[in-house]
């Protein structure tokens, strides 16, 4: 089949790499415009664009597809002229109007990083960890105009462990998403079968995965240790949980575990011990967490042993 692929970050590039190994023809790639990145703020192509260029696939980077503007209408017409059988969309980042969704012969299929209708929206991986879900997965759906509202065609399941961060879970789901889309597109007959058997989402089970904002990554010591630990793992690698030491300095917290230490009548935010495991801090409900990797402004992330050597934190200190 002739496939258009639309995606931007590494999650999408993993799926594109898998599709490139199939017998299908990737006739075009759509991705977000190049963005400034890194310390030099150089214009940098997305991971999907880099992969497409390596395979000499034509790359399109429209700003939008709004038919109310000349450039949007031109982008729609350009896509239609490609004559695709199907379009695969993964973390593309642009809204696709109904006219675009209807253009390919079999419409547009989306690789979504959750078990829909749970966690529709921008941050399904992070929200699943922060909420304490013990399972997530991939849903392949036929796209509709609403936000992740399309009919479901295929699901795979992935346990969430107590050690998973958004970084580790992202990589597991990216691999699952790649396998899932290849299974759905094994042949034109297979695709037709999954389309015929697709399932409407139960709106009563909908939960939204709202976009992350930096401010919510500030650690709230009044929460119990289990919730603090979930948040630390959910916000790794972005925006990274932090302790606001003073107006200008934030201590980033990359990793943690539930502490085996305890102290009677400890104040929330109080450091009760510093040892080879890490920095043990009192949380709400008389629970305790152990910070195992932290990073001071301008420095590198430190492990438990290195934290103790800095002597920048001390037992009895109350973290804000």
Curated annotation (Swiss-Prot):
A UniProt-annotated Pfam family: Formyl_trans_C
Residues binding (6S)-5,6,7,8-tetrahydrofolate: 114-117
Entry superkingdom: Bacteria
UniProt cross-references to InterPro entries, sorted A to Z: Fmt, Formyl_trans_C, Formyl_trans_C_sf, Formyl_transf_N, Formyl_transf_N_sf, Formyl_transferase-like_C_sf, Met-tRNA-FMT_C, Met-tRNA-FMT_N
Catalytic activity from the UniProt record: L-methionyl-tRNA(fMet) + (6R)-10-formyltetrahydrofolate = N-formyl-L-methionyl-tRNA(fMet) + (6S)-5,6,7,8-tetrahydrofolate + H(+)
Keywords, comma-separated and alphabetical: Protein biosynthesis, Transferase
Gene Ontology molecular function: any one: methionyl-tRNA formyltransferase activity
EC number(s) reported in the record: 2.1.2.9
Gene3D superfamilies in the cross-refs: Formyl transferase, C-terminal domain, Formyl transferase, N-terminal domain
UniProt xrefs under SUPFAM superfamilies: FMT C-terminal domain-like, Formyltransferase
Record flagged with keyword Transferase: yes
Coiled coil: none
Cellular component terms per the entry's GO annotation: cytosol
Keyword Hydrolase: no
PANTHER family in the record: METHIONYL-TRNA FORMYLTRANSFERASE, METHIONYL-TRNA FORMYLTRANSFERASE, MITOCHONDRIAL
Family: Belongs to the Fmt family.
Function: Attaches a formyl group to the free amino group of methionyl-tRNA(fMet). The formyl group appears to play a dual role in the initiator identity of N-formylmethionyl-tRNA by promoting its recognition by IF2 and preventing the misappropriation of this tRNA by the elongation apparatus.
Protein name according to UniProt: Methionyl-tRNA formyltransferase
Organism per entry: Acinetobacter baumannii (strain ATCC 17978 / DSM 105126 / CIP 53.77 / LMG 1025 / NCDC KC755 / 5377)
Gene behind this protein: fmt
């Amino acid at each position: 089949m002739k496939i258009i692929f639309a995606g931007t970050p590494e999650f999408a590039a993993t799926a594109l790499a898998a599709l490139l190994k199939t017998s299908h023809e990737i006739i075009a790639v759509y991705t977000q415009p190049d963005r400034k990145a890194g310390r030099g703020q150089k214009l940098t192509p997305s991971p999907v664009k880099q992969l497409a260029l390596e395979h000499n696939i034509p790359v399109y980077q429209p700003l939008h597809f709004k038919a109310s503007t000349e450039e949007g209408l031109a982008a729609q017409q350009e896509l239609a002229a490609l004559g695709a059988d199907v379009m695969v969309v993964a973390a593309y980042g642009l809204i696709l109007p109904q006219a675009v969704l209807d253009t390919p012969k079999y419409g547009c299929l989306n690789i979504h990083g959750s078990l829909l209708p749970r966690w529709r929206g921008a941050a399904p991986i992070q929200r699943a960890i922060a909420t304490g879900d013990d399972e997530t997965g991939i849903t392949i759906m036929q796209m509709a105009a609403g936000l992740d509202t399309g009919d479901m065609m295929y699901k795979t399941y992935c346990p969430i462990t107590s050690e998973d961060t958004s970084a580790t879970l992202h990589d597991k789901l990216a691999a699952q998403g790649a396998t899932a889309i290849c299974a759905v597109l094994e042949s034109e007959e297979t695709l037709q079968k999954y389309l015929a058997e697709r399932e409407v989402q139960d709106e009563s089970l909908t939960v939204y995965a709202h976009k992350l904002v930096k401010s919510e990554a500030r650690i709230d010591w009044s929460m119990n240790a289990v919730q603090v630990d979930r948040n630390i793992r959910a916000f790794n690698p972005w925006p990274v949980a932090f302790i606001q030491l003073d107006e200008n300095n934030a201590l980033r917290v990359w990793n943690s575990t539930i502490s085996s230490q305890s102290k009677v009548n400890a104040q929330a935010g109080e450091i009760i011990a510093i040892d080879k495991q890490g920095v043990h801090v009192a949380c709400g409900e008389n629970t305790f967490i152990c910070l195992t990797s932290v990073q001071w402004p301008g420095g590198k992330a430190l492990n438990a042993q290195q934290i103790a050597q800095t002597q920048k934190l001390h037992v009895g200190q109350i973290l804000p």
